């Protein structure tokens, strides 16, 4: 099948993994991003589309034309800010092509609600709350689609785990953009006397001095991310506050890598996990700190839980699983 993807080409992005998985499954993939139609840095281009309506129309009209030239059997869009006219033009010119949207982010990231203004054939999103809202209130053809892991990227390091933990020498790792809510939680853990390493982007608008010394000044991806997470005793994964009944992509990636994580409790985790969720989740920051201190002294239990989760997630929660599910729901598989 010939499939077009409209979205980012960055390594370790959702679109990267969709592209990789569809190719792995034997499909032909045409992948187009904004940078393919205009050579302006993403940040400047993004704000230009916000400020100048004609520019926004122009960019996405060019993208629509490129997709139409390819005449794919299926178009997968992921950006939340794709102009509705782009989708309309593709569907007008490709009558037999299905055009869908996959939204992997928390429900606070709908931009100007372009997704709702566009006539996609189907919508896929990860939170049952917004799935119900889209189906029941707007009568949109919406399906539940959790996040996933890429087995060719998110996989365990082939090293002795105890030796790697000694080399990495990190009790608790937190990674990603250090938003204020995440920084405040990190502060609480650090103030309790726990050795925390922070990887990713610090919050330069509202920095917290007490966590500055814990930053490693490194953004981790790929093999390096797998090495750091697998070699850390505990990965603390605090979900965005807008994850109403969903899990972030880190939840799946960490389990795919085989690292041991503690994360926020959500009822939906019971659907994903091979392990009793009470063992690795918390409902308060005090409970998180208590469990961190407990598991730091339980290496064999940590390794047992994470190994079981890793095997389960590689069997049930890969992007290949998700792509097959999508194609089945669209009657294309």
Predicted regions and their residues:
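A charged, aromatic-enriched C-terminal amphipathic alpha-helix characteristic of glycosyltransferases
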Residues: 296-330
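Active-site proximal beta-strand in glycosyltransferases
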Residues: 91-106
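Catalytic alpha-helical scaffold of carbohydrate-active enzymes acting on polysaccharides/glycoconjugates
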Residues: 64, 68, 72, 88-89, ...
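Nucleotide-sugar donor-binding catalytic core of glycosyltransferases
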Residues: 1-48, 58-62, 70, 78-85, ...
